[in-house]
Amino acid sequence: MTTGSGVAVAVSPHLDDAVFSVGGTLAALAAAGWTVRVVTCFTASVPDPSPFALACQLDKGIAADVDYMALRRAEDEAACAVLGVQPVHLPLPEAPHRGYPDPAALFAGVRGDDRVAAALVPALRPHLAEADLIFAPQALGDHADHRVVSETVAALRPDGLWWRDVPYVSRQPAASPWRGVPDGVEAGADISDHLARKVTAAASYHSQLGFQFGQIGVAPLLRNLAAEEAARLGLPGAVEALRGRMDHLRLIGAVSPGARGMDVVPSAAVQREPLKDRHCD
């Protein structure tokens, strides 16, 4: 990990994605003296949600009169405080508030009439312009919001580092990055010293835990996944896997198996939750 006063920006589709996926790396950068920001794209409160959007709230046990997104923004602030990073919330609506009518639509590609990228580009541009390191999702799982973010960041800052989306990667470990993600080296960042902090931060998203992690639970899944990623890449310790330029990967202390002359080994067996057909986030 390179110490210094650089600026790192993680572009998160939803209020939890960056912390679930690369929270250990973000905590390590903050501990090394970097300024770290998590810029979450789709955080707007919507006073009159569509039936599907409201269902995404009700099925988590949250009453209809609660401002669901305000609750989630507060959870994100708590999680970021644990990691020592700064939260930034862009006031754009999530896909269920943009005309996606059901879970199947969320994973069927970006709608032709979805113009949110036109608003996302100018909202993101100033945050990306000042960053020395950019983190963004590979869009594993093919959620429309993740794909919009991946494509937008790839257009603005193709030199980013691309994370494997959690919890989707735990359900689909062999999934490939969305085709719009730039080619790059895959490497593992050792988060052994920061895994406990990542788990604590992830547990701040109380409204999402049962829905996203099921009976396995957030702590076992994140610990198992970090060990799995290390085994898959032939690396020791607990690892978050990222893809990108080798010079940027070296800034975070990430190691490529090829660079070490190591063979990739099969992923360790771990209990998995099935994909939920009603998945909203």
Residue ranges of model-derived segments:
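Serine-dependent carboxylesterase/thioesterase catalytic core
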Residues: 153-154, 162
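The feature marks non-catalytic terminal segments
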Residues: 2-4, 74-92, 101-105, 133, ...
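Active-site beta-strand->loop->alpha-helix modules in alpha/beta enzyme cores, enriched
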Residues: 1-151, 277-279
